[in-house]
Amino acid sequence: MGRKRSASSSRWLAEHFKDQFVQKAHKQKLRSRAYFKLDEIQQTDRLFKHGMTVVDLGAAPGGWSQYVVTQIGDKGRVIACDILDMNPIVGVDFLQGDFCEESVLNALLERVGEGKVDVVMSDMAPNFSGMSSVDIPRAMYLVELALDMCRQVLAPKGSFVVKVFQGEGFDDYLREIRSLFNVVKVRKPEASRDRSREVYIVATGYKG
């Protein structure tokens, strides 16, 4: 006899397939609904311009990278990384590996090269256990790694957009970002589910 889905997972699946952004993504042959989150951020904050170099952390299945290539044009460049595999996207240099591992970080830095990048973006999230005492520290560890990437590769006046889950450590992290960037906003895009703790910190004017 097969295992039955839990009530919560069945509810999530029902919500997922009814979601207008999931339906739009499917209709437009987009990688994921995350495409629309970044589009809303771009309409408000104007992070991406033609010819930019962008680092995409936690890139799979590719919604953000897919969006960014439409904004930066054929002279721009996206360097993307995820622990999961991702189907190729024209204009995206993809590295599969665990960003938490030093060898993967070094490989990513090698792909970036000697120059600095214009935007670092992170949609990374841990595999959630359902226990906030475990999940939130894991999520905060990933966003700290993303901020460390900014310190290493982001050009002065560059931008950073990162998915963060509200909980313990959020306020301290926000203060840390405010010390490094001139303008910092917290966004909750329409395409982000209301029940989700996720928000997006959008930081511009890197002081590095």
UniProtKB/Swiss-Prot annotation:
Cellular component aspect of the GO annotation = cytoplasm
Q: What InterPro entries does its record include?
A: RNA_methyltr_RlmE, RNA_MeTrfase_FtsJ_dom, rRNA-MeTfrase_E, rRNA_MeTrfase_gammaproteobac, SAM-dependent_MTases_sf
Coarsely, its chief localization is cytoplasm
Q: Which reaction does it catalyse?
A: uridine(2552) in 23S rRNA + S-adenosyl-L-methionine = 2'-O-methyluridine(2552) in 23S rRNA + S-adenosyl-L-homocysteine + H(+)
Indicate the residues that form the catalytic site.
Answer: K163
Q: Where in the cell is it found?
A: Cytoplasm
Pfam families linked: FtsJ
Give the molecular function GO annotations: rRNA (uridine-2'-O-)-methyltransferase activity
Residues engaged in binding S-adenosyl-L-methionine:
G62, W64, D82, D98, D123
Domain of life from the UniProt record: Bacteria
Q: Which UniProt keywords apply?
A: Cytoplasm, Methyltransferase, rRNA processing, S-adenosyl-L-methionine, Transferase
TM ranges are none
Q: So what EC number does this one have?
A: 2.1.1.166
Enzyme class, spelled out: transferase
The record's annotation in PANTHER family points to: RIBOSOMAL RNA METHYLTRANSFERASE, RRNA METHYLTRANSFERASE 2, MITOCHONDRIAL
Q: What is this protein called?
A: Ribosomal RNA large subunit methyltransferase E
The scientific name of the source species is Glaesserella parasuis serovar 5 (strain SH0165)
